[in-house]
Amino acid sequence: MKNIAIIGASGYTGAQISSLINAESTMSIQGLYVSENSLDKGKALSDLYPAYSHIDLCLTPLTDDAKQTIVATADAVVLATDHGVSLHLAAWFYQQGLAVFDLSGAYRFSDVAQYPKWYGFTHEYSQVLADAVYGLAEWNAPQIATSKMIAVPGCYPTASLIALKPVAHLLTDILPVINAVSGVTGAGRKAQLHTSFCEVSLTPYGVLGHRHQPEIATQLGQEVIFTPHLGNFKRGILATITVQLAAGTTASDIEKAYQCYDSAELITVKQNQFPKVDDVVQTANCHLGWKFDEQSGYLVIASAIDNLMKGAASQALQCIKIHFNASVNH
């Protein structure tokens, strides 16, 4: 039985992974934690999320004593916290010998020079960063199994990379174009005007400047044009990706490339059929659909995931299971 501490449990992602871990027969929740100044400290998780009434745990403030208790009693820590918070907590728990699964972006880039530009801080833990593994579960399982510092990918990069990595060897110098729409939960639980019921609409944001663009490019090995959009629905991501493939590429070549997912039970690939968000909401699955025009050489791929599940919590759980050698296919 692996004992897992969850820090940042009051947010959408933290609550989601709390529910997932609570349902695992080989795992237990060591504790649910929030910051010392959180207005939610002391509340039951079910007070914030009645759907989780079966989880009889309260949100504990993360004091120094609480951190020492985690080190003494937990096998792993999940960080569902802001990048600037995870930066320090991840390094501290890692240095204490715990496995760390960080859902923020604080350890996704191996290059320290990326952090001031994209996250607004200077990374001061170069050795921990050097040990960090990018937790794209279907692609980096051997590294996830052996590292104790796992940077769980962002939601948009997960949807995009699962779609693009199988055909990366077929790409030309023309940049892939990724247009992706996310549900409002992707913006977090904190009240904001642009995510309020009367204001939310379908709109692009972070145009030519979203931090997930370099994350996708780094892991793909090629620059991309990425435009995220906020949709007027709660959860889910649909990414539509257009790429030009090398001259002479055939539909059979693409079909063969996607056979890398034949044994990946959480990924479904279909030719000339396209997914919708409702197909994957509340699941750990990724649905891909693709169509290829041999005359122009253009391939269009659609990738659908639940942003809180495969785009965050359930992928973190996959990484935990890979690390502790448990079954991941449910």
Swiss-Prot record:
Source domain of life: Bacteria
Active site: C155
UniProt subcellular location: Cytoplasm
Gene3D superfamilies xref list: Dihydrodipicolinate Reductase, domain 2 (3.30.360.10), NAD(P)-binding Rossmann-like Domain (3.40.50.720)
PROSITE patterns: ARGC
UniProt xrefs under SUPFAM superfamilies: Glyceraldehyde-3-phosphate dehydrogenase-like, C-terminal domain (SSF55347), NAD(P)-binding Rossmann-fold domains (SSF51735)
Pathway the protein takes part in: Amino-acid biosynthesis; L-arginine biosynthesis; N(2)-acetyl-L-ornithine from L-glutamate: step 3/4
Cited InterPro entries: AGPR_AS, AGPR_type-1, NAD(P)-bd_dom_sf, NAGSA_dehydrogenase, Semialdehyde_DH_NAD-bd
Role noted for this protein: Catalyzes the NADPH-dependent reduction of N-acetyl-5-glutamyl phosphate to yield N-acetyl-L-glutamate 5-semialdehyde.
Protein name as it appears in the record: N-acetyl-gamma-glutamyl-phosphate reductase
